[in-house]
Regions:
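Active-site Gly/Thr loop motif
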Residues: 119-127, 152-207
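Secretory-pathway/luminal and periplasmic proteins that interact with or process carbohydrate-rich
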Residues: 57-61, 106-114, 155-162
Length: 207
């Protein structure tokens, strides 16, 4: 933490910052051989990779696809709810428990929990979110090649909308991580590198 103001140990809703945390736990499952990025998941023709990259064709909410997989970048809570089901089936434990065992406990994120949807229901303190940010910067829980893949745009030609910021063509997204690319306006700093990765949430959270 470079600078802080206020109570950094107070627990706040993470909103969609829940998504990259759950995505990272899915990559742990991939590394352990429990899930493959190319396993079928969600709508017909979609895979775990499509769900992580918001390329499955699912809408924001609801399980009726609005596009074929790999045609549009459609930001989808539903896709991450389905990803949670995939994790539970593959690991044999609830998604909240899986994330706790593979992410929160190893990183020392003592205040963090996901008491509801794996798309948006996470809670944690700012200090704990900073621990996850440090993991993204220098991965310890996911191997180097897989972490590097997560930070590369999947289906890079897809256009799509970043909620609250507009439509971009292309709209790069990695495996659960938004990639800055050439998007303007954007929630990251104006001079941020196009390779910047992270996520923001409606509650005012970001990582």
């Amino acid at each position: 933490v470079v600078y802080s103001h206020g109570d950094v140990d107070r627990v706040f809703p993470l909103a969609s910052v829940t998504k990259p945390i759950v995505a990272w736990s899915a990559l742990v499952a991939v590394e352990r051989g429990l899930i493959s990025l190319d396993d079928p998941a969600g709508p017909e023709g979609a895979t775990v990779r499509h769900l992580l990259a918001h390329a499955s064709g699912l809408p924001f909410e609801g399980r009726r696809p609005v596009a074929a997989p790999e045609k549009r970048r459609i930001y989808s809570n539903e896709g991450f709810d389905i990803l949670g089901e995939v994790i539970e089936t593959a690991t044999g434990v609830g998604v909240a428990q899986w994330v706790r065992e593979t992410i929160f406990e190893p990183l020392g994120m003592a205040t963090a929990d996901i008491p509801g949807s794996p798309a948006h229901a996470g809670v944690a303190s700012a200090s704990d979110v900073s621990l996850f940010g440090a993991e993204l910067a220098r991965p310890t829980l996911v191997n180097g090649p897989l972490a590097a893949l997560a930070a590369l745009s999947q289906f890079p030609a897809l256009a799509g909308v970043v909620p609250g910021y507009g439509r971009f063509n292309p709209c790069p997204w990695g495996l659960g991580l938004e990639i800055r690319g050439e998007k303007t306006p954007h929630w990251t700093a104006p001079d941020a590198s196009p390779r910047t990765i992270g996520h923001f949430g409606q509650s005012g959270s970001f990582v």
